[in-house]
Amino acid sequence: MRKSLLALSLLAATSAPVLAADYSDGDIHKNDYKWMQFNLMGAFNELPGFPDGSNHDYLEMEFGGRSGIFDLYGYVDVFNLASDPGSDKSGKEKIFMKFAPRMSLDAVTGKDLSFGPVQELYVSTLMEWGGASEVNSQKIGLGSDVMVPWLGKIGLNLYGTYDSNKKDWNGYQISTNWFKPFYFFENGSFISYQGYIDWQFGMKDEYSSSSYGGAMFNGIYWHSDRFAVGYGLKGYKNIYGIKEVNGVDSTGFGHYIAVTYKF
């Protein structure tokens, strides 16, 4: 399963021609693959902070793949692993979960819906659960796989956001993600540039102190077949629609380190 993902990454990295999804032959499972890994993470100055950013550790189970008409990415984070009373996460929600299933319109219709750099179209969803009073939202919209210079294939999705805590729709989000191997070693391991952008806009004044906000993660990781080690710089701007004011830190930079084991 992991080899399938690696093969796709290597294909993009070598700039080989990438064909649009074609399911006209009826075989919707020909592009199936799956992967899973555990990441031991350290976060430094993670935002938002009240009043300062958080420094803490957590374990992340991360997974994804493709099965027929469905494309999936997700993770489950478990915070404060040792239940340290001195941790910034002590007394707070223990788990955060994110699931992002997409349904391929190309596979559903059996037609090639590609155009220009757009390789495949999806109905995209995104579900985030952070506990009783934390971020709890569901998003739905239009998604795509797009070919861009150097990076290769990226995911690009536009959602409308439903806030489960408020029981109301609240703005929109545009998201993109990428994975680009760019340096290869003789033993088959490689270094990648990987990351994502999540940008919210059009949020209502009654629910958010800022109508816009988001984050960008830029990671440099070393990968082998079984392990990965990396550093990520995450930039925040009014994250979650929280405006930067006295006593609230929602704009700035956070730092992340990760040690990964792949299954």
UniProtKB/Swiss-Prot annotation:
Family matches, as InterPro entries: Channel_Tsx-like, Channel_Tsx-like_sf
Residues annotated as signal peptide: 1-20
Keyword field: Cell outer membrane, Membrane, Signal
Any one GO cellular component localisation term in the record: cell outer membrane
Presence of the UniProt keyword Repeat in the record: no
Subcellular location: Cell outer membrane
Main location: membrane
Gene3D superfamilies, sorted: Nucleoside-specific channel-forming protein, Tsx-like
UniProt protein name: Outer membrane protein OmpK
Species assigned in the record: Vibrio parahaemolyticus
The organism's taxonomic lineage, starting at the top: Bacteria, Pseudomonadati, Pseudomonadota, Gammaproteobacteria, Vibrionales
Gene: ompK
